[in-house]
């Protein structure tokens, strides 16, 4: 039985997908004990990047058409609006660490390819072969099918990991990391590392981030739109639903089909929200009382948005990570 949530969850951190839960617990512990926002977000993202069980982020990520794992990550400081990102990097163990350090720069803060890897080497950040045997085998088996362009879609179950955090004083920040679309063309980049589209943070209002089919998300500044609606007085949950609906309707009018988009957000008071075009999108909220899993849902016939707290039956039967 689904019990709909009437009020927005409250907390200091929010993240996308069930795969982020362990990392969010670690990040939340740092935030509660030390109130170090950047450290908390980076730690939470790194936990997902390091886990080969999650094939859309970091180590074990599914490769591009040539069998190489290409990674994107970004970090934004809501106090300064400083943003760092690395794009299309290979063999970098924790792209979020590089993005975080770059966010402190005034210029040259978004680096791609070889330039990003040279920076990581200069900073002494660890490298490793990011392609696991499991991902390699899946690639070898499925490349024979030569997946058609129109068949590519965001992962069933999980995609970009997005972490938003808020300090006790109201500072906001967010970090995102992904290995991108499976079997993508080499060099393909989605929405994740692009400010305003894949993420946005402004401590004067709040922060938001998106996950799903990047080519659809970056046809507008979805994350920025959510934060602006919060700034203009909309409750965070309403801002998520309204911004996503406006964005999706804009695409639908032009003949696009629903390939999956989801968003999370938090205002600078700690009110959290999420919305999706999927039937189910799990997200995690953390604060002084620990972590709690929630699910955003959209009725595929009516378009109605709602949140619910999953029960034991849902947790047992759901295949969504």
Task: Outline where the language-model segments fall.
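Alpha/propeptide regions of enzymes that mature by internal proteolysis
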Residues: 1-321
């Amino acid at each position: 039985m689904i019990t709909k949530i009437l009020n927005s969850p409250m907390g200091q951190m929010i993240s996308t997908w069930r795969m982020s839960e362990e990392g969010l617990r670690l990040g939340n512990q740092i935030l509660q004990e030390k109130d170090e926002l950047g450290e908390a977000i980076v730690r939470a993202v790194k936990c997902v990047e390091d886990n080969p069980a999650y094939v859309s982020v970091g180590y074990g990520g599914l490769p591009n058409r040539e069998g190489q794992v290409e990674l994107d990550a970004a970090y934004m400081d809501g106090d300064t609006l400083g943003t760092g990102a690395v794009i299309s990097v290979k063999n970098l163990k924790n792209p979020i660490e590089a993005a975080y350090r770059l966010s402190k720069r005034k210029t040259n803060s978004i680096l791609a390819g070889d330039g990003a890897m040279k920076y990581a080497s200069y900073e002494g950040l660890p490298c490793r072969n990011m392609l696991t045997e499991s991902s390699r085998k899946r690639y070898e088996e499925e490349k024979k099918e030569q997946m058609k362009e129109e068949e590519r879609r965001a992962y069933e179950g999980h995609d970009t990991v997005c972490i938003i955090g808020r300090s006790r004083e109201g500072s906001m920040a967010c970090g995102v990391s992904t290995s991108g679309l499976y079997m993508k063309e080499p060099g393909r980049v989605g929405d994740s590392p692009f400010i305003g589209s894949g993420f946005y943070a402004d401590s004067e209002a709040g922060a938001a981030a998106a996950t799903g089919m990047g080519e659809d998300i970056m046809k507008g500044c979805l994350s920025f739109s959510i934060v602006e609606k919060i700034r203009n007085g909309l409750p965070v949950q309403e801002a998520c639903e309204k911004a996503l609906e406006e964005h999706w309707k804009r695409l639908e009018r032009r003949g696009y089909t629903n390939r999956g988009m989801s968003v999370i957000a938090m205002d600078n008071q700690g009110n959290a929200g999420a919305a999706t075009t999927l039937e189910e999108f799990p997200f995690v909220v953390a604060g002084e009382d620990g972590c709690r899993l929630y699910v955003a849902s959209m009725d595929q016939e009516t378009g109605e948005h709602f949140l619910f707290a999953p029960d034991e039956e849902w947790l047992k039967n759901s295949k969504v990570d």
